[in-house]
Every structure is written in structure tokens, then in C-alpha cells.
């Protein structure tokens, strides 16, 4: 299956340059100017984002929220209802499976918006809380692997907003004044989850200018797919890959 992955649009809805089977969106979708305002965010998702997403040259859109998506934190169920009847699937610490016709491969996608806490942003929970959520996620993934593996080959994708600690978590943009340019600032609970879950690939955003080339963590390929730099200017192209 051909995937295309993006993150950290912050309201910039550029059309995909090439078709794919599935679009993965790793959060921070809403414009910065609307992020704290429920009425404006709701209208933007309904009138701008959903029409854009449904017009992209893909069969399925799978997405999580990010720390700027306050409306999704408060009204995720309402957004899911908005998406009913479309091919947009919104995940909040959930596992789904997708497949292609006449193909023995099935793809399990676990999506989480949870981020390492700093400041007063959306979906930021203490790491112990996150570990409990991820323990439930791991149990669900392993149960489904056991059920499905006799009949299908299973590939797994972890779609997260945050970056895991230790890989793909060093910001490279020198103009980022609050950062020393060398410290790992990823999410330790997420890194532990990856080590235990062993997905084929982790797609993330959040840290805009970390390395966009693949890095490895415990056998899992980790890729940052943010579109913008730390100044919120478009700096990267969508990431295409096959699995």
C-alpha cells in the first residue's frame, strides 16, 4: 500500500502532489489564529478541512490531533460525527485496520495525540498517565495480531503527534531560541510504547525541524513528517512510502 504522511499544517491546506492509497495526518491541523476558539475552529474543520481532505487523491485519510488542536481535545466525538460518510478516520488512542481488495496484507494503525507535558497545551498528559493509555493500546494491538495473524500478514503503523525520546527529536533549526540545539526532547513514554509494540513505522510531527530522514528505534522506522519549520513557514514536502 502506498502511504503519504504529513503533519503540522497549522491551517495551510496544500494539495498533495501525487496520489496515494492512504493519507496519514499526525496532528496540529487547525490554524494558529483559531486554535483557542471553539466556534471558529469548528467552522474551519467543517468548511475548510473536511472538504480539502475529501478532495485529496487518496482512498482513506487517517488522522490524529496535536497539541494546538484544542477543539479536537474537547469535541473529538463531534468531529467524528462531522466526518461520518466520508473516508476520514479520526483516532484518539485507538486502533483501526485497513486493507486493500485482493491483498492478504492488513494494516493496523494505532493513533495517539498524547504529548510530553510542557505549558498549557492540548493533549498533554503526565507520562504515567500516558503509560497506562499505551499499556491498553499494546494489549489491543497484541490481541488483534493474535486474532488476525492466522489469516493475514499484518503491518502496523504508530501515528503519533509527539516524537519518541532518543530519535528524531533534536531540533535542527538554529533560529529556535529556546532550545540548545543538541538535547533530546522527545517523549519517553512513547519511546517505551514503540519498543514494546514494535510497529513497522512510527509517523510523527510536533517538532517541526527534526531530521526528516528515517531513523531507527528498536527495529521501528521513525519519521518526522512536519510540513513547516519553527517559524511556521512551509519547508518540507509530504512524505511518501510503501509498506
PLM region spans:
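Conserved beta-sheet core of the metallophosphoesterase superfamily
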Residues: 60-64, 167-243
Amino acid at each position: 500500500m502506498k502511504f503519504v504522511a504529513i503533519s503540522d499544517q497549522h491551517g495551510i491546506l496544500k494539495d498533495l502532489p501525487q496520489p496515494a492509497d492512504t493519507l496519514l495526518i499526525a496532528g496540529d491541523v487547525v490554524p494558529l489564529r483559531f486554535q483557542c476558539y471553539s466556534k471558529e475552529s469548528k467552522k474551519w474543520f467543517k468548511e475548510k478541512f473536511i472538504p480539502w481532505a475529501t478532495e485529496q487523491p487518496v482512498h482513506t485519510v487517517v488522522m490524529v490531533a496535536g497539541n494546538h488542536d484544542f477543539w479536537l481535545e474537547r469535541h473529538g466525538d463531534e468531529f467524528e460525527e462531522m466526518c461520518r460518510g466520508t473516508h476520514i478516520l479520526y483516532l484518539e488512542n485507538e486502533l483501526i485496520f485497513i486493507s486493500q481488495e485482493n491483498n492478504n496484507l492488513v494494516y493496523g494503525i494505532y493513533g495517539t495525540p498524547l504529548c510530553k507535558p510542557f505549558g498549557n497545551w492540548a493533549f498533554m498528559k503526565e507520562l504515567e498517565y500516558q503509560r497506562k493509555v499505551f499499556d491498553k493500546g499494546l494489549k489491543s494491538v497484541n490481541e488483534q495480531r493474535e486474532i488476525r495473524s492466522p489469516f493475514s500478514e499484518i503491518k502496523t503503523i504508530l501515528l503519533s503527534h509527539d516524537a519518541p525520546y532518543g530519535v528524531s527529536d533534536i531540533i535542527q533549526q538554529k533560529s529556535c531560541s529556546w532550545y540548545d540545539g543538541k538535547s533530546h526532547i522527545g517523549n519517553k513514554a512513547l519511546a517505551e510504547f514503540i519498543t514494546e509494540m514494535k510497529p513497522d513505522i512510527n509517523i510523527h510531527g510536533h517538532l517541526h525541524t527534526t531530521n526528516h530522514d528515517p531513523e531507527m528505534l528498536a527495529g521501528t522506522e521513525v519519521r518526522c513528517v512536519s510540513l513547516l519549520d519553527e517559524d511556521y513557514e512551509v519547508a518540507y514536502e509530504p512524505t511518501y512510502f510503501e509498506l
